[in-house]
Regions:
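Long, contiguous binding/interaction regions
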Residues: 1-66, 74-76, 94-169
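Short beta-strand-to-loop capping motifs
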Residues: 36-38, 83-89
Length: 169
C-alpha cells in the first residue's frame, strides 16, 4: 500500500503522541523506539518486515534483562516497536547505537531513545558520529537532503542487504 506524505506526517504525530503516553504511563523509564528506514511511498512490505523483525530481535537480545515492556505495532506506515527500560537514557542510547552499527541490517534501523521527559538523545550524546549513507557512506542527512541517490539505487541496496541477511539465517 502506497503512503502519502499526509499519511506519513499523521503517523509521525501519532507515534510521538504514543511515545508521550507510554512515558506518562511508565514514569521514570527510558523509551527506546525502533522504526525501519524504508525510502519511497511503500513503507510496509516483505523487506521492511524482515528488517523490523530483525531489529526487534536485536532489541530483545541487547536489552535482555533490562526490558520492562516491549510493544510492537504493524502499521501501513511501517513497523514500530517500543521498548521501556530502567536503563539510563545514555546507556540505552549506547546500546541502540551498537545495534545500528554492528547488526547486519543495523543501517536500516532507526532506533530513537527518549528520556523520562520525552527528550530524544542524539548519537553525539554517546560520542557517536552521524549516521552514514547506505550508498556512499557519506553523512546520510546530507545525501537525503540533496537527493544524492535515486530511489531505485536505495531500494536495490536495501534489497541486497536483506537478501544477504536472509541467506545467513
Amino acid at each position: 500500500m502506497e503512503i502519502t506524505l499526509e499519511d506519513l506526517l499523521k503517523s509521525r504525530d501519532e507515534r510521538h503522541a504514543h511515545q508521550m503516553q507510554l512515558l506518562k504511563e511508565h514514569e521514570g523509564l527510558t523509551l527506546v523506539c525502533l522504526t525501519v528506514v524504508m525510502p519511497g511511498s511503500v513503507k510496509r512490505n516483505v523487506q521492511s518486515l524482515v528488517a523490523a523483525h530483525a531489529g526487534v530481535d536485536a532489541l530483545r537480545e541487547r536489552f535482555a534483562g533490562e526490558t520492562v515492556s516491549l510493544e510492537e505495532r504493524d502499521l501501513d506506515t511501517g513497523y514500530e516497536a517500543y521498548l521501556l527500560t530502567r536503563l539510563s537514557p545514555l546507556e540505552a542510547k549506547e546500546r541502540a547505537c551498537e545495534i545500528e552499527e554492528t547488526h547486519m541490517l543495523g543501517r536500516l534501523f532507526d532506533i530513537d531513545v527518549m528520556d523520562a521527559s520525552g527528550c530524544p538523545l542524539s548519537r553525539s550524546a554517546v560520542g557517536r558520529g552521524a549516521r552514514r549513507c547506505l550508498i556512499c557512506d557519506g553523512e546520510a542527512r546530507y545525501c537525503m537532503r540533496n537527493h544524492s541517490h535515486s530511489l531505485d539505487e536505495l531500494q536495490a541496496r536495501i534489497n541486497s542487504m536483506i537478501d544477504a541477511y536472509v541467506q545467513r539465517i
